[in-house]
């Protein structure tokens, strides 16, 4: 079994560790901002052995800190080091927009992630929602197609796996939210 944990910050609540421990036949992938990682958290994950965190990054320091707050990039890098040093698998999640598409899918960024120990990246397409959605941040059709090309190139030329939520949708039958819940 495999479960993805989304919404909020899963490392903020201690009861998640009890769930991971109780269901040790399930592999969990919690998506995290990475700000709560320290030796204690890394040791717990090492002991559990069934949790693969996905750190949210919007690119390098400039892109990540401008979207997520000053100092977040460095904190995520520290968290990655803690996990890598313990042999704990982890990956990265990026919300792609016109501001960061060239960074998060660049060879330089992927090479940095590989050196840090990341095994994979998820690319999610920015969708404008809320009271004041900014459609200018949405990827253009050509940028979406280019992301698919870059994703396939990374998969075939690097020891790294990428999932492009837009272009890979046909392989998984599309988005279940759009098919069953909306």
Residues of each region from the PLM?
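Radical SAM/AdoMet-radical enzyme domain recognition
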Residues: 1-6, 13-125
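A C-terminal junction/extension of Radical SAM enzymes
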Residues: 126-182
């Amino acid at each position: 079994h495999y479960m993805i944990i989304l919404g909020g910050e899963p490392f903020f609540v201690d009861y998640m560790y009890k769930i991971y421990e109780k269901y040790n036949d399930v592999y969990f992938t919690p998506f995290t901002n990475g700000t709560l990682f320290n030796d204690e958290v890394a040791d717990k994950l090492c002991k559990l052995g069934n949790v693969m965190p996905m750190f949210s990054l919007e690119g390098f320091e400039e892109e990540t800190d401008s979207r997520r707050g000053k100092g977040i990039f460095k904190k995520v890098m520290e968290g990655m080091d803690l996990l890598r040093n313990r042999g704990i698998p982890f990956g990265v999640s990026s919300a792609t927009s016109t501001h960061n598409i060239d960074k998060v899918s660049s060879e330089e960024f992927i090479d940095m992630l590989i050196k840090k120990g990341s095994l994979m990246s998820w690319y999610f397409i920015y969708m404008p929602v809320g009271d004041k959605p900014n459609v200018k941040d949405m990827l253009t059709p050509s940028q979406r197609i280019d992301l698919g090309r870059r994703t396939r190139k990374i998969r075939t030329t690097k020891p790294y796996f990428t999932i492009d939520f837009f272009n890979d949708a046909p392989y998984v039958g599309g988005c279940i939210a759009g098919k069953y819940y909306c």
